Amino acid sequence: MLFRSTSTKIQLASSNEELKQLKCQLDYVLNLTSRQESKEALASTQNLVALEGWIEQEQIEDLKMGLAQQFGGAVLLQIHEMAAADRQRVPIKLKNNALIEPFELVTEMYSLPKYEDKDPTPVVSVFYFIFFGMMAADIGYGLLLFGGTTWALKTLHVKPSLAKNLRFFRILGIGVALWGVIYGSFFGFKLPFALINTSTDVITILIISVVIGFVTVMTGLFLSGKKNIRMKDYAAAYNSGFAWMLILIGLALLAAGRLFPDLAMVGFIGEWLATVNAVGIVLVSIISAKSLKGLGPALFNLYNISSYVGDLVSFTRLMALGLAGASIGSAFNLIVSLFPPFARFSIGIVLFLALHGINMFLSFLSGYVHGARLIFVEFFGKFYDGGGKAFKPLKPAEKYVRYKK
């Protein structure tokens, strides 16, 4: 019996070694295939091969050294700075620090920026972190998400693309736990140190959601104005960006003045701020069109006030989904607590884990989908078009084998 067990272990070890060899051979074949496909794109004769492509700025010296070592003086390398005519076809590769880089997934899901655009990922990372955490707020859920992704990154040999997703959700797990601390929720149980009570402070959470939405919209409008200034379209910078920022701030001040009589002067300032900039949109449109034909587009632009109201209303989902997840978790705990003591600590534990597993999955799914929706529509809709083409360098296939420089 001992001999048979030892023999089985030897066979398994041998099979595992053969599997590793097969994986290496598969990567080798994939590399040969990729190399052959690249050769077909070359301009070549019997004695000459010409290759044109893009390379990252910091890799130019490595390329020169590699070609010199491999071919010596038999190769001619010409490096050209990007011309203005190439702006529409230059490929894009995002570059951010380790904390921001995982959120490139959100930007890439929508569209890469064009060469002349700024990478929105740093700003996206802040808002998405807040959105996801607020919609799935629970200390237990956040710790599980953080711990599970950390374990996977430490112990599993995953592809770089999957590792990036795991780092993305690990950071989001921190946001979920932090909002869980604010709401005082731990697997649906109410903790005594909650800063905001999800049962009694619903209006407070609603106001926070709208304020977060207001800041998001303001940021989008500011980036819109900044983008148009960079493109030297000053009329669009005012009409589509800065003017609406001032109008919405004015309306917010006006609302505060109406709600709180002591702030009547603030309301008066807000009313004038909104009115002056609404008139400013009309005047700038007429002046830029050099005729009264600019009046029509100006009035249509002012009609967009309804879309901004809709944007702010859309952010109430931050409250709705957060409260829904907390309420469902509490309901599951109540169901398990109604079991007799024996059942509570047997089948009740299994039921507790299963129900909270479902609620956690749905909370994360909702946070992922609705967080992306708020970014794509309410934020990107103000300033970002995308349309960039991804940079795809010639490199070895890494399906199973990882290469280190």
Language-model features, listed with the residues they occupy:
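Coiled-coil termination/hinge junctions
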Residues: T8-L63
